[in-house]
Amino acid sequence: LSVTVDDIKLSLRIDVTEDDPMIQSYLDAAKDYVQTAVSKNEDLTVYKQYDFAVSLLTQFWYQNRVTDMKQTPYQVISMIQQLRGLIS
């Protein structure tokens, strides 16, 4: 499984396509963020927690794009910690 722009749009109930490039950039950044936070060498895409963390983080960034985002949502941190435990 891999999270797609359409998955994010469905979750956020977005019907327009104007924001697709922005959502894709958030999605790419979220994948890198979670991967780097856990392990640069492990393939995390086999874990459901990876997709969930990527989806949550992408949605968070999209919904809060005009605010100062200093904290990663607790749920994302929880998924990252679970992934770290799974690969150790």
PLM regions: where:
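Divalent metal-cofactor coordination and adjacent catalytic microenvironments
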Residues: L1-S88
